[in-house]
């Protein structure tokens, strides 16, 4: 019977030591959750960078293989046109913002400030 109590004490101490390592030791549950969050953030960043890389790779391929991409870039970025081609630039009017009347100035034309109740 004495051996049974000794074994129970050893198992309780072992359980206590394992719990301490789980909660406070290296690689504890808090660190694991923090690392999982970092992995999630890094995977999201990697996905965005992969999409950017795919778009750049497609653009490089298009520039190597097709003349239309080179022509489009020359037109939009460098302002080039083909010989004999006419270039028309359409300039849109700037939006007109209505002028707000100043404080104490009546909103209707022809009213005198003394006439306003």
Swiss-Prot record:
Ranges in the topological domain labelled Periplasmic: 25-117
Cytoplasmic-side segments: 1-6
Keyword rRNA-binding assigned: no
Signal peptide annotation: none
Transmembrane segments: 7-24
GO BP term, pick one: FtsZ-dependent cytokinesis
Superkingdom of origin: Bacteria
Its job: Essential cell division protein. May link together the upstream cell division proteins, which are predominantly cytoplasmic, with the downstream cell division proteins, which are predominantly periplasmic.
Similarity remark: Belongs to the FtsB family.
Protein name: Cell division protein FtsB
């Amino acid at each position: 019977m004495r051996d049974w109590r000794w074994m129970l004490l050893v198992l309780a101490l072992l359980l206590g030591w394992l719990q301490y390592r789980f909660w406070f030791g290296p690689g504890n549950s808090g660190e694991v959750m923090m690392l999982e969050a970092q992995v999630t953030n890094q995977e999201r960043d990697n996905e965005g960078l992969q999409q950017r890389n795919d778009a750049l790779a497609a653009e490089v391929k298009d520039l190597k293989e097709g003349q239309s991409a080179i022509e489009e870039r020359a037109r939009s970025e460098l302002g080039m046109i083909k010989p004999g081609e006419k270039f028309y630039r359409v300039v849109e009017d700037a939006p007109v913002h209505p002028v707000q009347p100043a404080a104490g100035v009546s909103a209707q034309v022809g009213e005198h400030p003394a006439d306003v109740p």
